Amino acid sequence: MAFDWTSFIVRININAPAQKLYDAWATRDGMEHWFLRLSEYKKPDGDLRHNLEHTEAGDNYKWLWHGWPDDTVEYGKILEANGKDFFKFSFGKAGNCSVKIFRDIGENFVEITQDNIPDDDHGRTNWHLGCKTGWTFYLDNMKSLYEGGIDLRNKNILLKGLVNA
């Protein structure tokens, strides 16, 4: 059977309430706490959502990362957001990402599925391998922060080629 380069799944257990884990994805404050330098969610009418306001399906986003200049920006759309345990967004040419929050064996889990990744050399290298590496790091950072640890992100734009930026 051939390897499926068009999707992958990354999951981690995190000792935090499920709603807090969902809010980490669905609010500006949440995303900027563990993931991004800037997360803007805009309603379909163009109004910016407040920092603690949940984004909804149909909203657009703008994301900037720590350790990267402002011209490294991601624009996309929120495809689904149920307010408690499922969040899906477009991720540019890299496909779509679905986030599922669930409980199993007494633990809360965050699971990301990235799919619709182009099955060509660029897609395999940059989006399958690159995004899987990135999501692995950022989920580790989420776990660190939500379990009382430190922020592992590189915030120095002068440092290049790091796994944590």
Can you annotate each of these PLM segments?
Residues 21-22, 31, 61-63, 78, ...:
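Hydrophobic pocket/interface hotspot
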Residues 88-137, 153:
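Beta-strand/loop substructures that line and gate deep hydrophobic ligand-binding cavities in soluble
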Residues 1-9:
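Short acidic N-proximal helix/loop "leader" segments that mark the beginning
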Residues 9-10, 29-75, 154, 163:
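Short beta-edge strand/loop motif at the mouth of beta-sheet-based domains
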